[in-house]
């Protein structure tokens, strides 16, 4: 094979790889602990500064109005510099927060994963139309039950294995935010 043909094939493969991320890459970069609750054992709790605390099963979330957003997930600490691109499908976070009835003194939304990881968004940001609680990527079920999808924000805001949403009246800082990472996490 000529050097030119080799370079063309290599370039074509690289472009194909970067154009659409498969669920396999997401699986490799997000190990799911086997002992974490799944199925009927699992529920998403929404509480704190809300009028109507919620305890939602996976099935209840699946029958809520769904939306799909195209977004790119950029992990800050991924050694492979992988970018997960695609169509994320789920429920608008704002829909769930409205159902819970956010109290006026709430300033932050705290997200907790099943393994204790945390992140946060301001209440205003959390109500954006494009922020969803995703259960599918490119029409395939996510392996980690639910993931917060936050377009335009670094991956540490995209909490996977989401289990608890709490509204608080103080400036909470999540796992990485409390270590000096930007609380806004905007991708330039």
Regions found by a protein language model. Name each.
Residues 2-188:
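N-terminal intrinsically disordered, low-complexity segments enriched in P/E/S/T
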